[in-house]
């Protein structure tokens, strides 16, 4: 993410203030953040495609301070990992992954089932992070395919190649995703919620 990182996304640092604002909403208890994080081993197969990055236990695998919260639950990419029944005590759930796709972690489905039990039917995932044409795309597409509403926070995502990022945004909006700003995402948290039976 950051300059000097092994898999730096140029321009991503300009998104950090908006990523922090979105994360602050979780710190204030207004929203639960469901995120993913690469947690690779030194000999990970993904390194045949990308340079080694986010190796578990190294500074490069740490979440940047602006998007780090206190009450976080990290769920490893293992079928035997336990997903607590009650996630209400957390500000952020991190699904660890070793590929681009968060849905390769078998526990992603369990977290979504939990979220579905406790959210309104009109709940929407606001997606932010890097890189638009890789991890952001796969997370958004996976959610849309599972019937979730998705908004891409356009001023809190960044792409490796602008033309690929634009194609990705066009693809995702054609599948039903909305494009919103950080201000719009935060304003949506202020609207009163009504639950329908």
Question: Residue ranges of each PLM-predicted region?
Answer:
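Short, small-residue-enriched loops and turns at beta-alpha junctions
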Residues: 101-103, 157-161
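Glycine-rich anion-binding loop/nest that anchors nucleotide
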Residues: 122-138, 152-157
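Active-site donor-binding loop signature of nucleotide-sugar glycosyltransferases
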Residues: 97, 155, 182
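Histidine-anchored nucleotide/phosphate-binding helix
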Residues: 19-25, 134-145
């Amino acid at each position: 993410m950051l300059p000097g990182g092994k898999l730096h996304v140029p321009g991503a640092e300009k998104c950090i203030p908006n990523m922090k604002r979105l994360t602050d909403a979780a710190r204030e208890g207004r929203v639960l953040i469901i995120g993913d994080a690469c947690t690779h081993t030194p000999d990970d197969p993904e390194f045949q495609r990308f340079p080694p990055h986010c190796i578990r236990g190294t500074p490069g695998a740490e979440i940047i301070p602006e998007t780090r919260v206190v009450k976080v639950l990290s769920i490893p990419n293992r079928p035997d990992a336990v997903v607590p029944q009650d996630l209400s005590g957390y500000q952020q759930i991190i699904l660890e992954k070793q590929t681009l796709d968060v849905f390769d972690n078998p526990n992603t489905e369990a977290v979504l089932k939990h979220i579905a039990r406790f959210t309104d039917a009109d709940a929407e995932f606001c997606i932010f992070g890097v890189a638009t044409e890789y991890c952001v795309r796969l997370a958004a597409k996976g959610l849309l395919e599972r019937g979730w509403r998705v908004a891409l926070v356009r001023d809190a995502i960044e792409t490796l190649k602008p033309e690929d990022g634009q194609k990705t945004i066009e693809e995702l909006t054609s599948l039903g995703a909305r494009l919103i700003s950080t201000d719009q995402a935060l304003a949506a948290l202020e609207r009163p919620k009504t639950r329908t039976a």
